[in-house]
């Protein structure tokens, strides 16, 4: 682990039905329609990686990116990621069928395979980094809601900082991320379809998110990126970044000590 001072955003919930933040008409957010980033590089990662390598690439991008960057990616096999503060004992029962990985970010349990997974890196040199973590979280999800509203039904953001009063689906853990909407999560027809978690260091901020029910083949990824910035360009990842990712995958994310840290 780095010696840098690091914080991981983890929003816990209680039993209360959330109200909604209107993604199109919220008087408290006059800049809701203004793109978050002046410039944004996009990395459409077409390779299917192991869970450890996916986490490693995200961290390597945080360490090397010179500007705001969004990465969209696949999973080599069905996977389950859980937050930095999560307990391995809560997910161990899924080890036989899924590739388990502890994220560097906070949050709950997320099942991967049929989702559109993304990460956003914001270097400390970018003005957006100076905003609060929850403000960044909300603005990113507003952009996602805008992208979804162009091709899907009514999409809103959960306003309450507490989770919905609902009974978890049978067979799913109570700390399943998508069973517990929190403030600024993306909702469609009363159901959470997108959530995320963050890690902030002196180098920048990393947000890792999952959009359930949307495959990489859809045009949602491009619409999402364009809602975040009107000046997008494709990222060419350097061999140096890949080498750093391979090191992190082997020495950190792929190790038993990291997986069973708690």
PLM region spans:
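Active-site loop/lid in soluble adenylation, ligation, and acyl-transfer enzymes
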Residues: 33-95, 99-103, 109, 230-262
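Long, positively charged amphipathic alpha-helical accessory segments at protein N-termini or as interdomain linkers
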Residues: 140-172, 176, 199-262
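Residues forming anionic-ligand binding surfaces in small-molecule and nucleic-acid pockets
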Residues: 108, 112-127, 207
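Short terminal or interdomain "cap/linker" segment that borders an active site or interface and mediates
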Residues: 43, 47, 171-203, 208
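Short, conserved charged micro-motifs
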Residues: 90-92, 127-131, 216-222
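Ser/Thr-rich, low-complexity intrinsically disordered terminal regions
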Residues: 80, 86, 165, 181-182, ...
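Compact, glycine/acidic-enriched structural inserts
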Residues: 128, 135, 151-153
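Intrinsic disorder/low-complexity segments
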Residues: 1-38, 154, 164-173, 230
